[in-house]
Amino acid sequence: MTISSARTARRLPDLTSSAFLVIAFLTGIAGALQLPTLSLFLSTEVQVRPFMVGLFYTGSAVIGIVVSQILATYSDRQGDRKTLILQCCLLGALACLLYAWNRNYFVLLFIGVLLSSFGSTANPQLFALAREHADRTGRGAAMFSSVMRAQISLSWVIGPPVAFALALGFGFPAMYLTAAVVFVLCGLLVWLLLPSMPKTRVKSAATLESPRQNRRDTLLLFTACTLMWTCNGIYLINMPLYLVNELRLPEKLAGVMMGTAAGLEIPVMLLAGYLTSRLGKRLLMRLAVIAGLIFYTGLTLLNGSWALLALQLLNAIFIGILAGMGMLYFQDLMPGQAGAATTLFTNTTRVGWIISGSLAGIVAEVWSYHAGFVIAIAMLAGAAVCMWRIRDV
């Protein structure tokens, strides 16, 4: 009996860690089924102009920041992240049901986006819970986080091609219903498998160190990550419409490009997690900026299908390092506040969507989808300035 109990105890951490990986994959799938086709959905199903498409992304980001910041503050001070993640998954499923059958732009913008914001917040909360679990069990936080990020990338290998196949072959309702089922399954696994870690009040200065000591570096990192995510947002908004309307390439190519980049991100994330102790997060983030500059320059110069696919290696390096190392960089600068640090990093994505939504819509309306990539190059130059001024930690 004693031997059996000991063996079970040894297996439990592995089961829990595996559950984190599976749930990270499912939350990634839920997002990867919706985001790649959103601009196409708004322009063809809801039938709005490019400016309104950009406005939708901007409004979505603003609401998302408010929701995630409120939940992050609550989760860092009290409550149980497990319950919060479960509730977010169920609200995400409700959002998918609304998108499946409603075609009123403003209903989608306000009610749909509010529900979706809760759904998307499940992901940063999952990573915050994983960080706490890794710290408690003695696992390497950097490598464990990189493996979880790799699950997100794996979901994006599968999600975008499936999303375009469902949307173009069976209609957008089928695509959104599939995403709703994934959210429900994710919530079920959270309820059954994730550990509960209720908050306890700890007043140790070592564990609750104020991030104000690193205010300058946190601000520089926030600015750099925001600019980098803005470029990615412009790419994700413009790219499907750019391929179809300006390059006259097949719609499904967008899904293939996204899936290819996501597949290449997996080894990039794992390698970055392995190298972080040797090279440091700052150097890796600088490499990401350089890869991004070359990638967006290539987008402005090349227009063949195979050339665009080949460029995805640079895109994978850019996003793979940013997604994996950026969050850990914030957590290092804000010790004892895993939820706030993780959500602050997530909010760089959302602020990026605010900027990219506005820019992508206006630039496409006034000039072209192609011009958005030129603006991305200038933004990456600004991100490079920030990354070359920030200190290593």
From Swiss-Prot:
Presence of keyword Transport: yes
CDD domains per the UniProt record, alphabetical: MFS_Set
GO biological process: cellular response to glucose-phosphate stress; D-glucose transmembrane transport; lactose transport
Family: Belongs to the major facilitator superfamily. Set transporter family.
Alphabetized Pfam families for the sequence: MFS_1 (PF07690)
Induction info: Activated by cyclic AMP receptor protein (CRP).
GO molecular function, one term: carbohydrate:proton symporter activity
UniProt keyword terms in alphabetical order: Cell inner membrane, Cell membrane, Membrane, Sugar transport, Transmembrane, Transmembrane helix, Transport
Broad class of where this protein is predominantly found: membrane
Record field: transmembrane: 22-42, 51-71, 82-102, 107-127, 152-172, 174-194, 219-239, 253-273, 287-307, 308-328, 344-364, 366-386
Species for this entry: Dickeya chrysanthemi (Pectobacterium chrysanthemi)
SUPFAM superfamilies: MFS general substrate transporter (SSF103473)
This protein's encoding gene: sotA
InterPro entries from the UniProt entry: MFS (IPR011701), MFS_dom (IPR020846), MFS_trans_sf (IPR036259), Sugar_efflux (IPR004750)
Function per UniProt: Involved in the efflux of sugars. The physiological role may be the reduction of the intracellular concentration of toxic sugars or sugar metabolites. Transports IPTG, lactose and arabinose.
GO cellular-component term (any): plasma membrane
Protein name in the entry: Sugar efflux transporter A
Topology of the protein relative to the lipid bilayer: Multi-pass membrane protein
Top-level division of the source organism's lineage: Bacteria
Compartment list: Cell inner membrane
Annotated PROSITE patterns: MFS
